[in-house]
Amino acid sequence: SLFHKAYNFILKSFFRKNLKHIYYGKEILKEINKINKKQDVIITIKGDFIDPKSILEFKKHTKKSIAFFNDNTYRCPKIKQVIDCFDEIYSFEKKDCEKFNLKFATNWIYNITVSSCNKNTAEYDVFNISSIDKRQPILIRIAEELKSKKINFNFIIYDKKHKSTNNNITYINTHMPLSEVNEHISNSKVLLDINRIGQVGLTFRVFESLGLEKKLITTNSDIKNYDFYN
């Protein structure tokens, strides 16, 4: 509603609070209270989307509160507001681990139901799906290069405002279901990964390529520092 939008604007502008984050925290606490039993461990992923007060309440219901962040403080500075709310914190971003004394943990592959099709029957040579941001010019240049070499590709960009246009890119303004993304991944020979500015942590796409035994093209040079790099 208009009232909630105005209220949320005031909270964020003057009190550095987000109404959605407060709501998420309250809803999680409701579920925790239903269990009515102290937990050995509570693991919170993307804790920057929950208000610090709720996270501190989580700690009353567990022996240990652990957080994992698959975004970095450069892109999501609110992570810094909740760092002190956990007993133990893991991050996929090495720079954040060094700067804030966090523990390092990579991302993972969670698409356990994805099947990898035969390379000879794959519809696309190269596939990428991403959100609209500063990576778009790089993606466009790669698309132009692949097209000039007659290499088949499927590049999809989620653009909520649907303002961008490029003949080599498919733009969508609603989130694509994970099952549909998995179909595109399965039906492609090579996955393309373009890391965000200020990010060196490896994305999920890297681990999907490992799990599905697909080739990977990435702009992230830090990949050479991992033990699986060849």
Residue ranges of predicted features:
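Nucleotide-sugar donor-binding catalytic core of glycosyltransferases
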Residues: 1-31, 35-39, 46-54, 70-203, ...
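Short beta-strand/loop segments at the ligand-binding rim of alpha/beta enzyme cores
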Residues: 58-69
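Short alpha-helix at the nucleotide-sugar/activated-sugar donor binding site of glycosyltransferases
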Residues: 209-210
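A short acidic/histidine/glycine-rich donor-binding loop in glycosyltransferase catalytic cores
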Residues: 230
